[in-house]
Amino acid sequence: MSLHNILVTGGAGYIGSHLVDALVGGGYEVTVLDNLEPQVHRSGTWPSYANPKATYVRGDVRDRAAFEPLVLAADGVVHFAAAVSVGQSMYQVDRYVDVNTRGTALLLDILVNSKHNVQKVLVASSIGVYGEGAYRCATHGLVAPTIRAEEQLAAKDWEQRCPVCHEHVESIPTPEDKALYRDNIYSMTKYHQEEMVLLIGKTYGIPAVAPRFFNVYGPRQSLSNPYAGVAAIWLSRLLNQREPVVFEDGGQLRDFVSIHDVVDCLVLMLEKPGADYLPVNVGSGEVVTILDIAKMLSRLLGSSIEPKVTLTGRKFDIRHNTADITVARERLGFAPKVSLEQGFSELIEWARTTPDAAVDFFDKAMQELQDKGLLVKS
C-alpha cells in the first residue's frame, strides 16, 4: 500500500488541522473538506493556522456533489467531520444523527458504488462508545456497570457499584473489547460511525481503523465552544477570571492525551497495517482526576482561582474511564511522549497568545442543560 493523496474531512478543526500539518510535513498531498461550523469556527472563515500547503474546500459531508469528487481523488480518507458534544446531542438529536451517522453513510456509499483508489480509511470514534469504563469487583471480578441511576446521583453516591453484589467497584484501564454501552446520542452516533466503517472495510477489502479518542487537549482547541472538552472549558473560564465548574466531587478518573501524541498515533494508523479493521484506544495511559486537571490549569496560569466543585451530577455523565493502550503500543509501536505538565503548559501559552481564543459561553450551555432537565437535582 502506498498512500499519497489524503482527504481529511473536518480538517480545519482541532485534531484534523494538526494531522494535516503532520501529513504535509511527511510529503503527502492533503485536501481538507470542512463546512466551518460556526460553533467551532466563530469567524466563519478558514483559521489562521490552516496549512498553506494543503488544499481547502468548504463543503458538507452530507452533500454528495461536494464530497464524492474529493473521495474519488484520494487514496486515503480521514473522516473527522462531526458534531461533537455529549450534552448538546441530547436535545439536538436530528442534527447529531444527520451529521455524524448520515455523513459517514454517504462516504461509505461512495466507496461501495463508485470506482475509487482509496486504500485506507480512518474514522474518528470516541471514549463515549464505552459508556462507563472497565471495573473490577473484589468479589465478582470484571464487571460492566451501566450509567448510574438519577437517584444514586441525587444521593451523592458517586462511585459505581457492582451490578451483582452492589458493592463499590474499582476503576481499571478500559480495553477495546470491553462491552459497549451508549448512554447519549453523541456516543450512539460514534458507535454507528465506527461499526459502519469497519463493516464496509472488511466486506470490501478497504483497510479501516477507528481511533477511539480519549480526552484530547492542546493548541487550537476551541476554547469558546462551551460544548467542547472539559479542559478547554475550564481554561476559558480561568482566562476570563471565572472559576472552573467541576461536577460531582471531582474524583472522576480520565485519560488526557496531548494532541501531538494523538497525531503520532494517527500517522501510524495510516502508514502501518497492524491495526487494520480494528477500533483502537488513543490515550496517554496516565490516570488523573478531573479536579486535579482543573487545579493544574489554575496553577500553571499562576491564578489564585479555585475550581468550584458542584456536588451535583448530570444525567448522561459517566464516573470513570481511562485508556488501556496496549493495542496501539503492540500493533503500531505507539509511545506517548508528552507529559500532562508539558502539554497543558503549551495549551496555556497558545491560549494566552491567541487573540479572542477564549470567550466564555459556559453559562449559556449550563442554562440549556437546566432547561432540558439534564441536571440532577439533589
Residue ranges and their predicted role:
Residues 25, 59, 239-378:
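C-terminal substrate-binding subdomain of Rossmann-fold SDR/epimerase-dehydratase oxidoreductases
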Residues 69-73, 110, 237, 265, ...:
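CheY-like receiver
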Residues 89, 162-184, 208, 212-223, ...:
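A conserved pocket-lining segment of Rossmann-fold NAD(P)-dependent short-chain dehydrogenase/reductase
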Residues 42-45, 132-137, 221-225, 293-294, ...:
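Short aromatic-enriched loop/helix-cap "lid" or pocket-rim segments at secondary-structure transitions
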